[in-house]
Amino acid sequence: FSQAPFKFQNSFYPEGKSICHSVILHTAGGIAGDDILSQNIHLAHNSKVLITTPAATKIYGSQGKKAIQEVKIKLEKDAYLEYLPQEIIVFNSANFKQKMRVDLDDNACWLGWEIIRFGRSARGEIFSEGNWLNYLEIWRKNKPIWIDRQYFMGNSPLFYASNGLGGNPVVG
């Protein structure tokens, strides 16, 4: 089930009955300062699902107010999830924190990505102010197998450094 501001669109099976494709729609159109959004995704034994979004997620500039999105994914034994949302666009002056935790049981498989675009580059906007913080944790049977923390401040030298983004506005 889903609760506002999220809505699941009708599931479909373009690959046949073996894997269900689901699209999560964020009906508000974007995430603003002081928003706190939570997603809890639970796949039962032997489930096979691909989850995506219909469009990029927009993180609006917030005058310092923090927006938070928390995604918790639990996959039971032999479950399979492809978590492939469209990109996240972090507008200039946004203050955004995302936490994702994936819990895997025996033989469960998760494939996922997060593609982040800093600033609305099609408009020439750069991410010169604000903060972006991302936590990703993947656990199998209560043991960590991957823990990653990423943090970018607006106008950070890492946006331009060769050991950073090298002047490119996208990471993923």
Residues covered by each model-derived region:
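N-terminal, charged/glycine-rich beta-strand/loop interface patches
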Residues: 1-87, 92, 99
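Solvent-exposed residues in well-ordered beta-strands and their adjoining turns
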Residues: 42-44, 76, 103-105, 139-141, ...
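Short C-terminal domain-edge/linker segments immediately following a structured domain
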Residues: 54-55, 71-73, 81-84, 104-105, ...
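Extracellular structured ligand-interaction cores
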Residues: 68-70, 97-99, 107, 133-135, ...
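Acidic (Asp/Glu-rich), glycine- and aromatic
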Residues: 91-99, 104-129
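A structural signal for small-residue-enriched, beta-sheet-centric alpha/beta enzyme cores
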Residues: 116, 120-172
